[in-house]
């Protein structure tokens, strides 16, 4: 029992060191000061319909905490397409989650980045991209692009650490809903969903 606890604590420490190194290498690419909590990750994955028969798109998986929650939700590794900008995080993810379709690329250029998956329809999108680090026109263009890749009524879920939606309202184009506020995260996390109007 004590050995398992030491192993878990060791893995958690390794994960936090990896996250910190990623943050040091590219602070604009990493939007938080700590990895997402497992509680927040499970809440994010809760919007997925694992019985839809459609793959799931994940953006900004970082160290893989959200990836793990998506897989635990019942999504098969082959049905998860995950885009990570950081090469260091990408290499770690490929080693840690065999069978998941990881792509090292830019979420703001999905037609090029997704390659063979560019015409896929996804059940939903789970995003941990640090949107507040980007100009508003890029944020809204990304949300519009993501909504074109999922069925009407299905969500794009975005985590953020600000008090309001990181994307401006466009009621004629999409609906914004505050999904949850998770205190058990450092910093506390706001979850937002976007669906086609």
Language-model regions: role of each:
Residues 12, 16-50:
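Class I SAM-dependent methyltransferase Rossmann-like catalytic core
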Residues 53-62:
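Conserved class I S-adenosyl-L-methionine
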Residues 63-75:
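Conserved SAM-binding loop of SAM-dependent methyltransferases across substrates and taxa
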Residues 86:
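Conserved SAM/SAH-binding beta-strand->alpha-helix loop
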Residues 89-116:
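S-adenosyl-L-methionine
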Residues 140-152:
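A short glycine-rich, Lys/Arg-flanked "PGG" loop and its adjoining helix->strand segment in the class I
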Residues 153-160:
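Conserved beta-strand signature within the Rossmann-like core of class I S-adenosyl-L-methionine
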Residues 181-197:
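Core SAM-dependent methyltransferase catalytic element
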